[in-house]
């Protein structure tokens, strides 16, 4: 559980900067220059967590309800929603306990609070790792479906998908336990940062290659229809925009947190890095925002899933 106040503590003692007292303040660092510090109110954390919680519960419920959605691709999307769901549950639980403790409505011994803090940290770290893994798995699944379409159902089988899903969850749990235990070791932090960079590179390479193939296919159709420029340019712009949104959201939501981890290793005492450390809460809020955006990008674009969601909302089980 974080230290009471506006500055949260995640994954042990990753951040030890003093709490901010205003929504937007300029906090001086040790050398005198001004640091821009954005404080995120607990109410905003709670609201973001609840929105993400509802969205991802709906995704999981829709996939569980509709047999047509029970395929490897949708299982990966479902697991991504479950990972984001863990982020939301951890955030809501953490914020609720913080507010109750601050209000004096909950009395707990320090040892109990510490144990609860450890559980929440494991949930948050595990959900982060699993989210990144399933984002990568979805990218690989889409790549195979495009470049190996005829062999897709023999390559991406249900048993193989289940083994991949099980391996990701086990690896995420072990990683979170190791990270919580050895969070103050440089190697552990660098491994996490390296993992993020690897996932970003994997997604960028696969999606760029898929966009290139799609544009090539569009050019072929355009030549047959003798309308090369309008079709190709329009399709290319639409594909580039989709790719920019997909990778941009991923980088903007996850990048600042892993930048924070990198700077802990590279310049823990430097004043400029100290300015970045002060915005740790903002980085956590961005991760929660990613849990809100993921269903919009990966799940709600499916017409079949949207139709099932309507049935779920109407309680027509």
UniProtKB/Swiss-Prot annotation:
GO molecular function: melanocyte-stimulating hormone receptor activity
Cell location: Cell membrane
PROSITE patterns, A to Z: G_PROTEIN_RECEP_F1_1, G_PROTEIN_RECEP_F1_2
Extracellular membrane side: 1-37, 94-118, 184-191, 267-279
InterPro entries cross-referenced by the UniProt entry: GPCR_Rhodpsn, GPCR_Rhodpsn_7TM, Melcrt_ACTH_rcpt, MSH_rcpt
Keyword Lipoprotein: yes
Disulphide bonds in the chain: none
Residues with a covalently attached lipid (S-palmitoyl cysteine): 315
Keyword annotations: Cell membrane, G-protein coupled receptor, Glycoprotein, Lipoprotein, Membrane, Palmitate, Receptor, Transducer, Transmembrane, Transmembrane helix
Stretches in topological domain Cytoplasmic: 64-72, 141-163, 212-240, 301-317
Any Pfam family: 7tm_1
Bilayer-spanning residue ranges: 38-63, 73-93, 119-140, 164-183, 192-211, 241-266, 280-300
Signal peptide limits: none
Membrane protein topology class: Multi-pass membrane protein
Glycosylation sites per record: 29
A GO term from the CC aspect: plasma membrane
Main location class: membrane
Record note on quaternary structure: Interacts with MGRN1, but does not undergo MGRN1-mediated ubiquitination; this interaction competes with GNAS-binding and thus inhibits agonist-induced cAMP production. Interacts with OPN3; the interaction results in a decrease in MC1R-mediated cAMP signaling and ultimately a decrease in melanin production in melanocytes.
Family note: Belongs to the G-protein coupled receptor 1 family.
Role description: Receptor for MSH (alpha, beta and gamma) and ACTH. The activity of this receptor is mediated by G proteins which activate adenylate cyclase. Mediates melanogenesis, the production of eumelanin (black/brown) and phaeomelanin (red/yellow), via regulation of cAMP signaling in melanocytes.
Record's protein name: Melanocyte-stimulating hormone receptor
Source lineage: Eukaryota, Metazoa, Chordata, Craniata, Vertebrata
């Amino acid at each position: 559980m974080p230290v009471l106040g506006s500055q949260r503590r995640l994954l042990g003692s990753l951040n030890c900067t003093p709490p901010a007292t205003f929504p937007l303040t300029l906090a001086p660092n040790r050398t005198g220059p001004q640091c821009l510090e954005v404080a995120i109110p607990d109410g905003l954390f709670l609201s973001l967590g609840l929105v993400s919680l509802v969205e991802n519960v709906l995704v999981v419920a829709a996939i569980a309800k509709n047999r047509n959605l029970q395929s490897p691709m949708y299982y990966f999307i479902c697991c991504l929603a479950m990972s984001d769901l863990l982020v939301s549950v951890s955030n809501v639980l953490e914020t609720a306990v913080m507010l109750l403790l601050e209000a004096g409505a909950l009395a707990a011994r320090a040892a109990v609070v510490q144990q609860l803090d450890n559980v929440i940290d494991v949930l948050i770290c595990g959900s982060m790792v699993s989210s990144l893994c399933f984002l990568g798995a979805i990218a690989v699944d889409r790549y195979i479906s495009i470049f190996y379409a005829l062999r897709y159902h023999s390559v991406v089988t249900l048993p193989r998908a289940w083994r991949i899903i099980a391996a990701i969850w086990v690896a995420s749990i072990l990683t979170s336990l190791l990270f919580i235990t050895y969070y103050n070791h440089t190697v552990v932090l660098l491994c996490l940062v390296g993992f993020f960079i690897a996932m970003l590179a994997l997604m960028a390479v696969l999606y760029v290659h898929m966009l290139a193939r799609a544009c090539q296919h569009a050019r072929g159709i355009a030549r047959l229809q003798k309308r090369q420029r309008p079709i190709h340019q329009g399709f290319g712009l639409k594909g580039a925009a989709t790719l920019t949104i997909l990778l941009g959201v991923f980088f903007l939501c996850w990048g600042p947190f892993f930048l924070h981890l990198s700077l802990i290793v590279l310049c823990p005492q430097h004043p400029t890095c100290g300015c970045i450390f002060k915005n740790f809460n903002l980085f956590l809020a961005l991760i929660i925002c990613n849990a809100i955006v993921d269903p919009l990008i990966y799940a709600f674009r499916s017409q079949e899933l949207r139709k099932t969601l309507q049935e779920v909302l109407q309680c027509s089980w």
